[in-house]
Structure formats: structure tokens, C-alpha cells
A protein has these predicted regions:
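Non-catalytic structural scaffold of enzyme domains
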Residues: 1-209
Length: 209
């Protein structure tokens, strides 16, 4: 007997993530719907996450919920903690929680790689929420973000991969979905390098089972 088909809604802050998450959902034989609002992250980076921005975020999540998904994933690590608290009638998941849980289960020195500064504190806080004694070490790679914004995705993943290779850690967390393409250049590393999209989709499917 076939398992029921789940519809997963995604709120993104960059168009590039639509293809990534669509492919992961299609692999599992489910449906997806996407809403992209780049201004949410742009304003968070420029001004921080205040009440007005949180209200806008929750409004966009309600728009997405009106499409009828069974579960929603916010794929922006800067904002996903606020998305979890939207209080919608469907579950709203943060993209990086399953990854964080896996990282603290591995333990040791956890290096957090991010190319957007506003992602660092939320990811650190999430790891410490998962394990209060986690040894979290921030490893920003902020100069690479200009490559992403310019559309130089190959240069971006090369820069991220080169940065990851300099780190001394027991597990490395790629704190943004945009960092995932760098994984293809890091297959020879013996240290686990974790990313969020695949585990987030698995968690979303499980949430509706």
C-alpha cells in the first residue's frame, strides 16, 4: 500500500533554494509549494529581527499555510527560530534543527560555518538548546557572501570549501542551505560535515506521518 502523499510548504529568502528542496521532496515522492521573499533576510541583516520583521515573517507563513500544505519548513537559518513560533494550524519547522541535533549527538568541537553574520548567533543558540554543554565554535566565512549575491555560485562553493578545509573540529555544521553545494568538494574529509536540507525534508515528512 502506498503511503499518503505529503505536501510540504517552504518559505525561502533566495530563489536558488527552490530547486534544492524541490528535488529532495520529489525524491521522496511528495509534493511541494514554495514562497520566496528575499526582503526578509535583507532586512534582518540590515536592521536585526524586530517585532515588525517578525510580524512580516508570520504574515508570509500564513500566506503559505493558506495554500494547504501539511507542514511548512522555513529554510532561512537567520529567521527559522522565529518561524517556529508562528502559531499556525500546521506545523512550522526550522530547517536546521535536525542538523543541530545530529551535531550535538556526534559531540566534540562543533564548528559553525556561515557566510551571513546574522546566521551565527541563531545557530549557536540552537546547538546550545539541543545540548547546553555543546562546544560550539563559530567559523564565519563572510567574504564569500558577496560571490553568492553576485550570482557566482561556483566561486561561492569553492570559497566555502576552502574555508572548511582550514577548520580544526570534530564536526562541521554548514549553517545555511546555500552552503550545501560545497559538500561536493569535501567528500575526502574524514570529519563529518553536516548540512540542513535533506534532514529537514525527512523531518517534515515524518511530522505528518
Amino acid at each position: 500500500m502506498l503511503s499518503p502523499m505529503t505536501t510540504i510548504g517552504f518559505l525561502h529568502t533566495a530563489d536558488v533554494h527552490v530547486e534544492t528542496f524541490h528535488a529532495l521532496v520529489a525524491e521522496r515522492g511528495h509534493r511541494d509549494t514554495h514562497l520566496v521573499d528575499a526582503t526578509l533576510l535583507a532586512d534582518a541583516r540590515a536592521h536585526g529581527v524586530d517585532e515588525a520583521l517578525t510580524a512580516r515573517l508570520h504574515h508570509r507563513l500564513r500566506e503559505l499555510a493558506d495554500r494547504g500544505p501539511d507542514v511548512i519548513v522555513c529554510t532561512c537559518s537567520t529567521l527559522s527560530g522565529y518561524a517556529e513560533r508562528a502559531g499556525l494550524p500546521v506545523p512550522v519547522l526550522r530547517v536546521d534543527r535536525p542538523m543541530a541535533e545530529e551535531a550535538v549527538a556526534i559531540g566534540g568541537r562543533i564548528a559553525v560555518v556561515a557566510t551571513v553574520a546574522s546566521t551565527l548567533a541563531p545557530t549557536r543558540d540552537l546547538l546550545l538548546e539541543c545540548a547546553a554543554d555543546a562546544d560550539v565554535r563559530l567559523a564565519p566565512c563572510l567574504a564569500a557572501w558577496a560571490l553568492f549575491e553576485a550570482g557566482d555560485h561556483e566561486g561561492y562553493r569553492q570559497a566555502v570549501a576552502a574555508h572548511v578545509r582550514t577548520l580544526d573540529a570534530d564536526v562541521i555544521v554548514l549553517a545555511q542551505a546555500s552552503l550545501v553545494p560545497a559538500l561536493d568538494l569535501l567528500g575526502d574529509l574524514t570529519v563529518p560535515v553536516l548540512s540542513s536540507p535533506r534532514s529537514a525534508v525527512d523531518r517534515a515528512v515524518a511530522a505528518t506521518a
